[in-house]
C-alpha cells in the first residue's frame, strides 16, 4: 500500500528517511535492524504499511501494520476516553456576613441539589466595609451551612479568607 500519512503524529512508508530501522513484524515479532528499503518491501509484500512508532530512537523503531486500521482504533479509543470523562462543574453559592437563618436554609437546599447532581459547590461569604474584622462570623456561617448539607457533601477546601470573601469548596460525597 502506498499510504502517505495525513496524520502528522506518525511517519509512514516513504516518509521514513533513515537508512536503517528496527522492525517489528505485524505479529509483534522482532525482525531486527534492516535497511529501510527492505523493510518497505516486506510491508508491501504483506499489503501493509511501515509506521515509525519511535522515530527519535537510534535506529528508529518501525512496525509493519495496517495504518488505516491503526488510526481508526486510535480515534475510537480517544472518543471512548472522552465519553468516559466526567466534566465537573463548580457552582457558586453566595452568602453575606449578615445572613438570616431562613436564607441560609434556602441557600443550603440549593447547594444540596448541586451536590446531588454531582457538581462541586463554592460557598462564598462576602464581607462589606469593616465586616472583615469579624471574619469569625463568616467562619461560623460557613460551619452552620456545612452542618445542613454534610450528609451529601464533604469539604474539599476548608474556609479561607481571600480578599473580602471567605471561601469554602464542597465536593459530593462518594457513594
UniProtKB/Swiss-Prot annotation:
<comment type="similarity">
    <text>Belongs to the IF-3 family.</text>
</comment>
<dbReference type="GO" id="GO:0043022">
    <property type="term" value="F:ribosome binding"/>
</dbReference>
<keyword id="KW-0963">Cytoplasm</keyword>
<dbReference type="GO" id="GO:0003743">
    <property type="term" value="F:translation initiation factor activity"/>
</dbReference>
<dbReference type="InterPro" id="IPR019814">
    <property type="entry name" value="Translation_initiation_fac_3_N"/>
</dbReference>
<keyword id="KW-0648">Protein biosynthesis</keyword>
<keyword id="KW-0396">Initiation factor</keyword>
<dbReference type="InterPro" id="IPR019815">
    <property type="entry name" value="Translation_initiation_fac_3_C"/>
</dbReference>
<comment type="subunit">
    <text>Monomer.</text>
</comment>
<dbReference type="GO" id="GO:0016020">
    <property type="term" value="C:membrane"/>
</dbReference>
<dbReference type="Pfam" id="PF00707">
    <property type="entry name" value="IF3_C"/>
</dbReference>
<dbReference type="GO" id="GO:0032790">
    <property type="term" value="P:ribosome disassembly"/>
</dbReference>
<dbReference type="Pfam" id="PF05198">
    <property type="entry name" value="IF3_N"/>
</dbReference>
<dbReference type="InterPro" id="IPR001288">
    <property type="entry name" value="Translation_initiation_fac_3"/>
</dbReference>
<dbReference type="InterPro" id="IPR036788">
    <property type="entry name" value="T_IF-3_C_sf"/>
</dbReference>
<protein>
    <recommendedName>
        <fullName>Translation initiation factor IF-3</fullName>
    </recommendedName>
</protein>
<dbReference type="InterPro" id="IPR036787">
    <property type="entry name" value="T_IF-3_N_sf"/>
</dbReference>
<dbReference type="InterPro" id="IPR019813">
    <property type="entry name" value="Translation_initiation_fac3_CS"/>
</dbReference>
<dbReference type="GO" id="GO:0005829">
    <property type="term" value="C:cytosol"/>
</dbReference>
<comment type="function">
    <text>IF-3 binds to the 30S ribosomal subunit and shifts the equilibrium between 70S ribosomes and their 50S and 30S subunits in favor of the free subunits, thus enhancing the availability of 30S subunits on which protein synthesis initiation begins.</text>
</comment>
